[in-house]
Design a protein with these regions (language model features):
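A structured beta-alpha segment of the ubiquitous adenosine-cofactor-binding alpha/beta core
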Residues: 14-15, 83-106
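N-terminal Rossmann NAD(P)-binding subdomain characteristic of aldehyde/semialdehyde dehydrogenases
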Residues: 1-42, 75-77, 82
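General beta-strand structural signal in soluble alpha/beta enzymes
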Residues: 54, 84-86, 107-109, 128-132
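Beta-loop-alpha module in the N-terminal Rossmann-like domain of NAD(P)-dependent dehydrogenases
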Residues: 25, 32, 88-95, 109-116
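ALDH superfamily catalytic-core signature
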Residues: 112-188
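Thr-Gly-centered strand-to-loop micro-motif
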Residues: 28, 48, 54-55, 107, ...
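PLP-dependent aminotransferase-like
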Residues: 38-93
Length: 188
């Protein structure tokens, strides 16, 4: 964690930027690819000095929270730095996001759910960090190994039978090598 002074365009003024832990961060876990997506929120949050409370979806409480907590515990994470609350979102979700303790609520999911969560989090003016479905792009540049790039594009598109929000939906090929890229891989 650090701070810095950033150059300001206004004479005789300075802009300061401070990075510091927020305290407790609430993470709402997903059902699909839950281990990876949940730890992607937890690991950096803990590394920056925050405590985490995770509410895994009731469909995947083990891979979306309990197993991750066990891994961190075995790695030596101090007690109470990572907590898991298991239950149906319909029963505990409102209380989880409107609770006054979390300084930040992290959620990856649909637009409708984000809107509902933002309204509930606003009760305590909690900060929110929402990640929606993205459109991952497979980028192929002139120095790429084309055989490997084609393989990576196919794997990226077909991984998890396309049920993952990170599945490749677009392939961008640098114009100078476009004609060298096998057309069949573009159909995937």
């Amino acid at each position: 964690m650090h701070g810095r002074i950033v150059e300001c365009v206004i004479p005789n003024k300075e802009s300061r930027s401070y990075r510091c832990p927020l305290g407790v961060v609430a993470v709402i876990s997903l059902w699909n690819f839950s281990f990876h997506l949940t730890q992607r929120s937890i690991a950096p949050t803990l590394a920056l000095g925050n405590a985490v409370v995770v509410e895994p979806t009731s469909d995947t409480p083990v891979t979306g929270g309990v197993l991750i907590a066990k891994v961190f515990e075995e790695a030596g994470l101090p007690p109470d730095e990572l907590n898991v609350i298991v239950g149906a979102g319909s029963q505990i979700g409102d209380e989880f996001v409107s609770h006054p303790i979390p300084s930040l609520i992290s959620f990856t999911g649909s637009s409708i759910a984000r809107i509902l969560l933002a309204k509930r989090a606003a009760v305590n003016t909690s900060k929110t960090l929402f990640s929606s479905s993205v459109v991952p792009t497979h980028l192929v540049l002139t120095d790429a190994d084309l055989k490997l790039a084609v393989h990576a594009a196919v794997v990226g598109k077909c991984l998890q039978q396309g049920q993952l929000c990170m599945v490749v939906n677009r392939i961008n090929i640098e114009e100078s090598i476009y004609d060298e890229f096998p057309p069949s891989s573009l159909i995937v």
